[in-house]
Regions:
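Nucleic acid-binding interface residues in structured DNA/RNA-binding domains
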Residues: 2-102
Length: 102
């Protein structure tokens, strides 16, 4: 049951997120693939939305497939800008330039 939200899965996802280097971003889909859940990018988003309950993780480094930040995570863009990540005029991260090469 790979789609079951359990503590092991949560920490597996968060351990991958911890590996994203400063100055880089990953997509929900990348994290899903790296955890063996290729078709579960939304599940990754759900886990990251609850990450504060599990400690300090750099979840601000995860964006959607187009480079958009998470709605409702108002500090995300500021944190990325502080790390030197630039945004295109459309408000998205330039994934060709800043995507984590994992």
């Amino acid at each position: 049951m790979k789609n079951v939200l359990n503590t092991d899965l949560i920490y597996e996802v968060l351990s991958v997120v911890e590996e994203i280097p400063e100055g880089r971003v990953a997509t929900y889909g990348q994290i899903a693939r790296l955890t063996g859940r290729d078709r579960n990018a939304r599940l990754i988003g759900k886990i990251l939305s609850m990450s504060a309950y599990y400690g300090q993780y750099p979840c601000h480094r995860v964006v959607n497939h187009a480079g958009r930040t998470a709605p409702g995570f108002l500090a995300q863009k500021e944190l990325l800008l502080a790390a030197g990540i630039e945004f295109r005029p459309n408000g998205c991260v330039d994934l060709k330039k800043y995507r984590w090469d994992c």
